[in-house]
Amino acid sequence: SSAASDVYKRQALSDNPDGKEWYKHRARQFTTTQLQPKEIHDLGLNEVARIKAEMDDVITKSGFEGSFDEFTNFLRTDPQFYAKTEEELLSGYRDIAKKADPELPKLFGKLPRMPYGIIEIPSYAAKSQTTAYYRGGSQKDGRAGYFYANTYALNTRPKWEMEALTLHEAMPGHHLQISLAKELPETHPLIQNLSYTGFVEGWGLYAESLGTEMGFYKDPYSKFGQLTYEMWRAVRLVVDTGMHYFGWSRDEAINYFCLLYTSDAADEHS
């Protein structure tokens, strides 16, 4: 119906009564800052430009002869960048984590007591799930924290993003930050379990950036993967404010995303 079509087209918060003010409130809530939508948008644009320049530099240093689009197409399509089995993919994540563990005391004075593991997302849920997620453990219940990796559709799980993803989800990323919060002594459970997206995901991004100091990103493809994850965050600053505050259409947002990010279409539309 035309009514349903109109609802589908109106996806921005700014389309609602007092929508722009509500969006400003949500921006403050999620970022824990006083940044205005225009400032967030401009920050995103500046970060996109910085990261794109670093990506171009990596491509040049890799010796690849071709354009940016040709390089990203090479990364997306060449069989060398993909595991052949689910077991190979999971083992790859676990190997990265084992390499990261001995580097952690060099960077952190306190590490969580909570153990962690890496397991696959259950097959019944994998098709509709994202690439990975973290689920915290419980000392009380004797449950470890887990980095859940998606092994569905192996041709969409490139090896060049595995180092950044592992550092983000496991150690020194979500597992370290969330577990330490839970282990704070004499702290109210609300504080131990309270989660602010800007901080939690910001910590994950920070953890990715520590990879160079920890001995990762030594090949140009993994370095490009790390920059791809940075670009993903920067692009979303632009797209989110663009759609919800500056009147961008859904197609404009998707097109901007696709210009700069190398993920598959399913992740882009999400």
Question: Positions of the model-derived regions?
Answer:
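N-terminal maturation segment of proteins
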Residues: 1, 5-263, 270
